[in-house]
Amino acid sequence: AIFTIMTKVGIYAILRVNGTVFDDAMAQSIFKNTLLLIGLITSIYGVIGAIGAERLRRFVGFMVLSSVGTLLIAIAMFNTQAWSAGLYYLVHSTLIAAAFYLFCGWITAQRGMFKDHLKVAPKIKNEKAAALTYFLIAMMIAGLPPFSGFLGKVFILQATAETAYQGWIIAIILIVSLLSILALTRVGFILFWRA
């Protein structure tokens, strides 16, 4: 859970340093070029890591990393609409990632010797409640409607209208969202369907 908070503190620090340390020309050069590329790569790397994760904790960590990439993309667009959308998404992703880590600890305790390994294991106690909780968290972290993650991503996508790389940003965010849904489905299938 501390990983979740510390990454978001880092994102907020990047946003705060932008206005106080750099002048506009230097900040635009750094943010629009370097930070956008880092955000796109981070988002893709996070979701690919989540797809290949073999432990539940690593899976959640990679999902957090992917959300950090989305936040970096919002900051790198260097406009107030994108920053507002990023701050909205920051609150959402922090709370959902913390809930996901708590869920991970609960599932790990329930699975006995299998712990958080993403392998088929015997059914756990309260499987229906656990499956429902996982389903809700998965929908929230993937940014599906009607949850706040969907609005955060929509706001970020709307903010791309003022950027030169609009097509790339929209394509990467949507592809990463789709791959996140696939990764979350894979983990849910292993934890609950095949048990």
What are these regions (language model features)?
Residues 1-195:
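Alpha-helical transmembrane segments of multi-pass membrane proteins predominantly involved
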